[in-house]
């Protein structure tokens, strides 16, 4: 997937496909338009990002065709979850990532939410994933990219991956065992 700003002319996405691109990643960072202006200054209209994601879904496919990351912890839970559901309903595979204010950035002093908050995010987002799973061209039991389930491999900044793996294990669709870290034998 190409992880870039969306082109101004969304028709360019057809050219990308002709060059061999098979997916896009247009990261929202946040779902609420007011937070988008504050957190993502200089990125243009959030509406254009949404339109680009929807165009990518039409061109590259539902689920695999367009991925977006949301930084969980930069906006209130309710609005973020509503936004994630809205994107997933349109075929945009949305992955919440844990917030960490980078040193030297305007958000350096902002404290991330606690672990319980992230557990709640993971549970609610995974409910959304399973609600729309049959409408997406993604097989959660086989796709090993981060943001999906990575076949039971843990990914530190996307806790919803571990929750998806846990539920798939309960359903008998993934082998038993805790999510694992690559290269670490336990």
Positions of predicted regions on the chain:
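Conserved AdoMet/S-adenosylmethionine-binding subsite of the radical SAM
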Residues: 1-110
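Auxiliary Fe-S-binding modules of radical SAM enzymes
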Residues: 55, 59-60, 77-186
